[in-house]
């Protein structure tokens, strides 16, 4: 790896990723050609066909009234990158896709903690997808591009950050796998980190992980592949480090030739030392007592009272510095919470470090929902609701990713009342989309195939109460609701949120010892005050999803392995509680549609649909069933009851698998046409017969056919004759005769599977 000046002022550096028998991937960074007015701009290439432009810009003046770092990350998917015109009404890109939003979060999570604390200038990173090979995913390339452009921008940034996707394929961790290679993977991880240490003794500090088991993991395990256990996941994190180091080195080399010098940016520390000392003097003792209150509401109320008292007592000496007092009070709270965990192995709600809060699980909590459940863990309360529908109701995805439809959709809602607050209610924010995606990925590996369960599934998680990891609560509630809806999951899935606290603790002999304490089932405060939080979902046998964020410059591998093992113990406990509520799929709700799958010959699809959809629309109108036909001849028939579905199937089979009617068969037909000499009656789709006018009067002469029957009338008829040309002659059958007659022989249906 080295930097090259390919033209005057245009530099590039390259990182080569060697995957052995799985091939080599090349990541190239170029600067000096595009977007030259941005503070930093980089074009990143993956094997020359996938091309992203990342720009970083900074405001000239700080937002000194902000008490947070104003970083914005945007990902712009341009449909021309895949040679497509947008499918929207105006034929241009609109709101960002879910893939783009999730990529923004992947970029933000490792970049944000890499900026110096106290920075208040607005920073905006925009990544534009210019070209995309359909065999590639662009998200991890975007992490590297965003880091590289920020590294060049002259900002107080402690990068670079490297990002890599590694997938476990045939026992090997493969970096930057293609979409085709991912189909053979059992586990897929996006890992971001940065180099730490000296040149001779450098390591990679993992900053962020987003991981999941693949859709077909269970089939691969059954075929002999190793299951993605906690041990395997830890090995994958280690396997990602050399790739991250190579990507960081390439960015460093580019910055060495093209980066702007770091500018002068005013920093706004949260508080000065004199404020913290004053707050600690008056608040340490009462705050320590308040932090021992187990209940969240009572603890928060008492803490707020102490904060108001501290503000009042210090106002005279620190007039105009109320924000600093508030920040110092928060810092003191963090210190006390962490000290109690590290020294006493006890937490603010009185639990030990491995204890789980009280668990509760129940199903069928909403009367008319197809499936519903309520899962509670302490003060976190999640309601899961499942809705089943026809496959044609699957979500159509118009993005640059390989996925074009989503049969399983998970939507997560986090209303403000879940934390006892007021706020905006409406379209989901990025956080809600991210939490929903995590819970969705956790369940996908255990969902039945479309052949096993021909339904589109919408899962909604309502966060009704929040005090720690509503996303993992959503995983548990989703499993319960799906089973209640009758979905035959391959295994139940549960999730748990874990935390890690570390610090140097002074021992009795005056020496210091570095301690790491892993916390099971973290509270909201522990999430905010800890050094790492990670969420693990899975079955009793393997991990299905994992999300990790850390502020530490490196976690000892044995510490991480122990924390993952601790998470599995907690997950097993939760699965046992869930099994007491429901341990197998329930009978489907009477309000859920019944969907039957049949096959028709591909060359008969056009006949079933009819010109301009006339035939399929008539079947739908007559039977009340919903019908969806796939290109391979699979037909999904859905109806509120089995009789309607069977009527539609009979009509479809009569067209696609026709059986010639026989003399003596009786049908309830529909009059489709009247003439001077009789009435034509539809027996089956495409099969009509004639009732002569002389047969309509029951032995009496009639002047007009319309005096007896009209178009649209239903009439019971019997086949009297079929001539050598296939013309069918019918005679009316009286109600008495029809009641005594055996049921008519209908066309035999194709093999059907009913759910």
UniProtKB/Swiss-Prot annotation:
Keyword RNA-binding: yes
Predominant subcellular localization, coarse grouping: cytoplasm
Enzyme class per UniProt: transferase
EC number: 2.7.7.8
PROSITE patterns according to UniProt: KH_TYPE_1, S1
One of the protein's GO biological processes: mRNA catabolic process
Biased composition, class Low complexity, residue ranges: 740-755
Catalytic activity annotation: RNA(n+1) + phosphate = RNA(n) + a ribonucleoside 5'-diphosphate
GO MF term set: 3'-5'-RNA exonuclease activity; magnesium ion binding; polyribonucleotide nucleotidyltransferase activity; RNA binding
Swiss-Prot/TrEMBL keywords: Cytoplasm, Magnesium, Metal-binding, Nucleotidyltransferase, RNA-binding, Transferase
InterPro entries for the chain: ExoRNase_PH_dom1 (IPR001247), ExoRNase_PH_dom2_sf (IPR036345), GPSI/PNP (IPR014069), KH_dom (IPR004087), KH_dom_type_1 (IPR004088), KH_dom_type_1_sf (IPR036612), NA-bd_OB-fold (IPR012340), PNPase (IPR012162)
Localization in the cell: Cytoplasm
Span of domain KH: 593-652
Single GO cellular component term: cytosol
Keyword Magnesium: yes
Sequence ranges assigned to domain S1 motif in this UniProt record: 664-733
Region of interest (Disordered), residue spans: 734-755
Cofactor(s) the protein requires to work: Mg(2+)
Function per UniProt: Involved in mRNA degradation. Catalyzes the phosphorolysis of single-stranded polyribonucleotides processively in the 3'- to 5'-direction.
Family under the similarity heading: Belongs to the polyribonucleotide nucleotidyltransferase family.
Protein's name according to its UniProt entry: Polyribonucleotide nucleotidyltransferase
Species this chain originates from: Mycobacteroides abscessus (strain ATCC 19977 / DSM 44196 / CCUG 20993 / CIP 104536 / JCM 13569 / NCTC 13031 / TMC 1543 / L948) (Mycobacterium abscessus)
């Amino acid at each position: 790896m080295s930097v090259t000046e390919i033209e005057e002022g245009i530099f590039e550096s390259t990182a080569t990723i060697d995957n052995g028998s799985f091939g080599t991937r090349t990541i190239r960074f170029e600067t000096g050609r595009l977007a030259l007015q941005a503070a930093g701009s980089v074009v990143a290439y993956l094997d020359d066909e996938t091309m992203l432009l990342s720009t970083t810009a900074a405001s000239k003046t700080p937002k000194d009234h902000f008490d947070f770092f104003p970083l914005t990350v945007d990902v712009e998917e341009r449909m021309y990158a895949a040679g497509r015109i947008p499918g929207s009404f105006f034929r241009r890109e609109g709101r960002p896709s879910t893939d783009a939003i999730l990529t923004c979060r992947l970029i933000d999570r490792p970049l944000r903690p890499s900026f110096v604390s106290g920075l208040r200038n607005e920073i905006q990173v925009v990544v534009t997808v210019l070209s995309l090979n359909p065999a590639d995913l662009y998200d991890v390339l975007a992490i590297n591009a965003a880091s590289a452009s920020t590294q060049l921008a002259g900002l107080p940034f402690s990068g670079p950050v490297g990002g890599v996707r590694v997938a476990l394929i045939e026992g090997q961790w493969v970096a930057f796998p293609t979409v085709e290679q991912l189909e053979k993977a059992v586990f897929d991880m996006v890992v971001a980190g940065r180099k730490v240490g000296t040149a001779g003794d450098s390591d990679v500090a993992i900053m962020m992980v987003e991981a999941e088991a693949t859709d077909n993991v269970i089939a691969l395990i059954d075929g002999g592949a190793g299951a993605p256990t906690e041990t395997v996941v830890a090995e994958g994190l280690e396997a990602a480090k050399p790739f991250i180091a190579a990507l960081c080195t390439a960015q460093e080399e580019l910055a060495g030739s093209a980066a702007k010098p770091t500018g002068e940016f005013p920093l706004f520390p949260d508080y000065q030392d004199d404020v913290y000392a004053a707050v600690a003097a008056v608040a340490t003792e009462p705050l320590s007592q308040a932090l021992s209150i187990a209940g969240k509401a009572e603890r928060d109320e008492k803490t707020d009272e102490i904060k108001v008292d501290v503000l009042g007592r210090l106002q005279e000496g620190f007039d105009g510095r109320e924000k600093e007092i508030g920040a110092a009070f928060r810092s003191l709270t963090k210190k006390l919470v962490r000290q109690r965990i590290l020294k006493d192995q006890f937490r603010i709600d009185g639990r030990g470090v491995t204890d789980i809060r009280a668990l509760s699980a129940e199903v069928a909590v909403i009367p008319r929902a197809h499936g519903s459940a309520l899962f509670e863990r302490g003060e976190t309360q999640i309601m899961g609701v499942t809705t089943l529908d026809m496959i044609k109701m699957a979500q159509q995805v118009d993005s640059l990713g390989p996925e074009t439809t989503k049969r399983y959709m998970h939507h997560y809602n986090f209303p403000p009342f879940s934390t006892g607050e007021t706020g905006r209610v409406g379209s989901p924010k990025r956080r809600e989309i991210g939490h929903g995606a995590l819970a969705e990925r956790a369940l996908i590996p255990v969902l039945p195939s479309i052949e096993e369960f021909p339904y589109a599934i919408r899962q909604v998680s309502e966060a009704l109460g929040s005090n720690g990891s509503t996303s993992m609560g959503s995983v548990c509630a989703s499993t319960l609701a799906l089973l209640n809806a009758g979905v035959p999951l391959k295994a139940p899935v549960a999730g748990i949120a874990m935390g890690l606290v570390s610090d140097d603790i002074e021992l009795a002999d005056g020496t210091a010892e570095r301690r790491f304490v892993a916390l099971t089932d973290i509270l909201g405060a522990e999430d905010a005050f800890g050094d790492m939080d990670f969420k693990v979902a899975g079955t009793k046998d393997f991990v299905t999803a994992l999300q990790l964020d850390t502020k530490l410059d490196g976690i000892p591998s044995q510490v991480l392995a122990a924390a993952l093992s601790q998470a599995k113990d907690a997950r097993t406990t939760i699965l046992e509680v869930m099994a007491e509520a429901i341990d197998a799929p329930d009978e489907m709700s009477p309000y859920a549609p019944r969907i039957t799958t049949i096959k028709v010959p591909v060359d008969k699809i056009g006949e079933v649909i009819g010109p301009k959809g006339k035939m399929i629309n008539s079947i739908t109108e007559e039977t009340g069933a919903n019908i969806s036909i796939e290109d391979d001849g699979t037909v999904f028939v859905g109806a509120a009851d089995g009789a309607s579905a069977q009527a539609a199937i009979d009509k479809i089979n009569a067209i696609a698998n026709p059986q010639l009617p026989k003399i003596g068969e009786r049908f309830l037909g529909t009059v489709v046409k009247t003439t001077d000499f009789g009435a034509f009656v539809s027996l089956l789709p495409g099969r009509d017969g004639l009732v002569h006018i002389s047969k309509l009067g029951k032995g009496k002469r009639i002047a007009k056919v319309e005096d007896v029957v009209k178009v649209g009338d239903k009439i019971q008829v019997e086949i009297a004759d079929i001539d050598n040309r296939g013309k069918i002659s019918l005679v009316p059958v009286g109600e008495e005769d029809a009641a005594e007659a055996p049921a008519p022989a209908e066309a035999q249906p194709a093999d059907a599977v009913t759910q």
